[in-house]
Design a protein with these regions (language model features):
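N-terminal "first-domain core" detector
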Residues: 1-51
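Non-membrane alpha-helical secondary structure
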Residues: 2, 6, 23, 55-62, ...
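Generic detector of well-ordered alpha-helical segments enriched in charged/polar residues
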Residues: 11, 15, 32, 63-71, ...
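Polybasic, proline/glycine-rich intrinsically disordered low-complexity segments
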Residues: 22-26, 30-31, 38, 94-151
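Short linear motifs in intrinsically disordered
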Residues: 33-37, 72-78, 88
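Short, surface-exposed beta-edge/turn micro-motifs
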Residues: 41-44, 80-84
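Compact, well-ordered interaction domains used in eukaryotic information-processing assemblies
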Residues: 49-82
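Canonical SH2 domain fold
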Residues: 67, 74, 82-89, 94-102
């Protein structure tokens, strides 16, 4: 008799990447070098977890603006001598980047039984919804909603 797996239990490509092996960008210098390697034209979906799923990949100008604004937010709100809250599946040619919100870290390394979800995800694979346990703070919601409306 063959064992079968219910179709609902087979992870999609996005969840496979989300739950796969990730590498941490420990220093601010590493993060700066990493941002420079990101191909802005690679078809990135920009997703604020808890907000609406992006239906199309962002344009290169939107990706550039996201990276610049995200870098400023992280450096301002994560007032530490190290970064340590950005993870990627590949540090030279990533398909998925998890960015943890400095104001909702919990245990982002996954050592707790209920690690928090990242605040933002950059993915070259269309994301599927992730359920936040808590509502997105109003300040983060405003930041996200205004990100591309300031042009």
């Amino acid at each position: 008799m063959l064992a079968t797996t219910p179709i609902d239990s087979i992870p999609d490509e996005f969840h496979r990447l989300m739950n796969g092996r990730l590498f941490n960008l420990l220093s601010w210098d590493q993060l700066t070098e990493f941002w420079a390697k990101i191909n802005r034209d690679a078809g990135w979906y920009l997703y604020a977890v808890g907000e609406e799923l992006p239906l199309v990949a962002a344009e290169s100008g939107q990706v550039e603006k996201f990276i610049v604004e995200m870098d400023m937010l992280l450096r301002r709100d994560h007032d530490e001598s190290y970064c340590g809250i950005v993870y990627a599946d590949n540090l030279d040619n990533p398909s998925l980047i998890k960015i943890y919100d400095p104001n909702n870290l919990g245990s982002s390394c996954g050592s707790s039984k209920n690690p928090p979800l990242p605040g933002w995800i950059m993915s070259r694979v269309a994301p599927t919804g992730l359920q936040q346990k808590h509502a997105l703070p109003a300040s983060r919601k405003r930041w996200w909603q205004n990100l591309f409306n300031q042009d």
